[in-house]
């Protein structure tokens, strides 16, 4: 792993330009000295108490005033990055913030790479790798669910779970390796096999639970995909528009108006639902409409929930066809046009359903409540552990595979050295998630390049 050059001081905008207030961030050994050289009154920052605010003026390299500013000074290791750090709060003008950056760079700073502040925080032990990734998730959070997941991971709930499990496995693996030093005494067993197998079983149960949470985590992070399907002119586009509170889809009495999928998202009770309006299902010779209907079936396969919009009792053949296409999905039947169409009772009463009028805005609240119920999202707290990162999911899946081989080795009565080899692979996978076993600079760069520059 590349070690930080402590003589290298970086700077970047920590907030977008154009707001009322902008923040320029500096971190590195010379951060305070460089900021002090551009600050008036002179030496005020050098003598400032740690974590204090100082009011003054920021100057360019020629001594010309750029702006009135408030400057925060943080001494290592008591800062976000663990290094000497300075944050300059100025007016949010792009010109002002750019001029401050120019002055800092001319005075010895380097423009930070994307995510470099958080990368330094990780390398300096201020947070582990999964917590660093949670910083990006927190910045990107758009609702209560994504915010809660990010805060839980940032607090270290996920990390502590893995570190505790890894420490237990490491202890027993060390005892297995100790047996190798006494291989001449085959009767010696330092690692209690019953205790080890019990721990492996508990690890399998815990990691399996985390792996299973990934589907929920991804849905919460990117939005639960909901396909709106049905025949032409049953009100699918009207339903999409009323759910989104805007005229997203064209509404017409002409059959086959919607020929392609239309997608948009909305938050319902702190959860993002990604609605997909699809082309109406019917027999047609129109080539373009046929393509749209094919895409409808594709969207059903991608959805977690399907809203089947009807305005009359479906036939048994239609039920059979829809149930087959929605196998493994959560299906809701939406009886539309309740204000004008004759009332009817569904023959399949076991399927969740709602009666609405998309045009007259009747029953929509009941439908959204049913969506939340059918989605069956777990109640999230600040301590909830939900996996939503593909890197974590893949590492956990590999760890689970290695643990399965450990159990097979027990069943076959294999020696401790063979069991130890697979246990080591489990330890590596768990360590990779928190960064304890990360050795590839390429891996770190791939993670942090997705951050904004000022973070």
Language-model regions: role of each:
Residues 2-13, 144-267, 284, 315-455:
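C-terminal-of-GTPase-core extension/linker across diverse P-loop GTPases
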Residues 54-75, 256-284, 302-305:
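Switch I (G2) and immediately adjacent beta-strands of P-loop GTPase domains
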Residues 1-148, 152, 156, 332:
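A glycine-rich (often HGG/GG-containing) alpha/beta subdomain
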Residues 19-20, 51-53, 302-306, 328-331, ...:
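Short glycine-/polar-rich loops that comprise or flank the Walker A/P-loop
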């Amino acid at each position: 792993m590349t070690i930080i050059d402590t003589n290298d001081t970086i700077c970047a905008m920590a907030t977008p330009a154009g707001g009322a207030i902008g923040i320029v961030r500096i971190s590195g050994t010379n951060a305070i000295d460089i900021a002090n050289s551009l600050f008036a009154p002179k030496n005020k920052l050098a003598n400032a108490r740690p974590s204090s605010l100082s009011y003054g003026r920021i100057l360019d390299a020629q001594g010309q005033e750029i702006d009135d500013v408030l400057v925060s000074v943080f001494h290592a290791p008591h800062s976000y990055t663990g290094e000497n750090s300075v944050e300059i709060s100025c007016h949010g003008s792009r010109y002002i913030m750019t001029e401050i950056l120019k002055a800092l760079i001319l005075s010895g700073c380097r423009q930070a790479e994307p995510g470099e502040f958080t990368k330094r925080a990780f390398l300096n032990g201020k947070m582990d790798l999964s917590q660093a990734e949670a910083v990006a998730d927190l910045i990107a959070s758009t609702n209560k669910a994504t915010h809660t997941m990010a805060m839980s991971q940032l607090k270290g709930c996920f990390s502590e779970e893995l570190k505790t499990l890894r420490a237990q496995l490491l202890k027993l693996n060390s005892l297995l390796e100790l047996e190798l030093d006494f291989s001449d005494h085959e009767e010696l067993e330092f690692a209690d096999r019953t205790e080890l197998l019990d721990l492996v079983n508990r690890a399998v149960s815990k990691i399996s639970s985390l792996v299973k949470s990934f589907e929920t985590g991804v849905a919460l992070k990117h939005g639960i995909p909901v396909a709106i399907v049905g025949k032409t002119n049953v009100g699918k586009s009207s339903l999409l528009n009323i759910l989104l509170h805007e005229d997203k889809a064209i509404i017409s009495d002409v059959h086959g108006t919607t020929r392609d999928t239309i997608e948009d998202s909305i938050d319902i009770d702190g959860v993002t639902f990604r609605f997909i309006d699809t082309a109406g299902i019917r027999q047609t010779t129109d080539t373009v409409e046929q393509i749209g209907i094919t895409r409808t079936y594709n969207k059903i396969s991608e959805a977690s929930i399907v809203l089947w919009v009807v305005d009359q009792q479906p036939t048994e053949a239609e039920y059979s066809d829809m149930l087959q296409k929605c196998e493994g999905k959560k299906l809701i039947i939406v009886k539309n046009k309740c204000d004008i169409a004759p009332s009817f009772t569904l023959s399949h009463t076991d399927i969740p359903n709602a009666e609405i009028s998309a045009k007259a805005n009747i029953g929509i609240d009941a439908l959204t409540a049913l969506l939340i119920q059918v989605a069956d999202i777990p109640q999230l707290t600040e301590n909830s552990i939900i996996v939503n990162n593909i890197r974590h999911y893949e590492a956990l899946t590999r760890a689970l595979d290695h643990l399965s081989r450990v159990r097979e080795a027990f069943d076959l009565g294999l020696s401790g050295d063979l069991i130890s080899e697979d246990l080591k692979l489990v330890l590596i996978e768990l360590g990779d998630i928190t960064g304890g076993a990360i050795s590839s600079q390429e891996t770190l760069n791939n993670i942090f390049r997705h951050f904004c520059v000022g973070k």
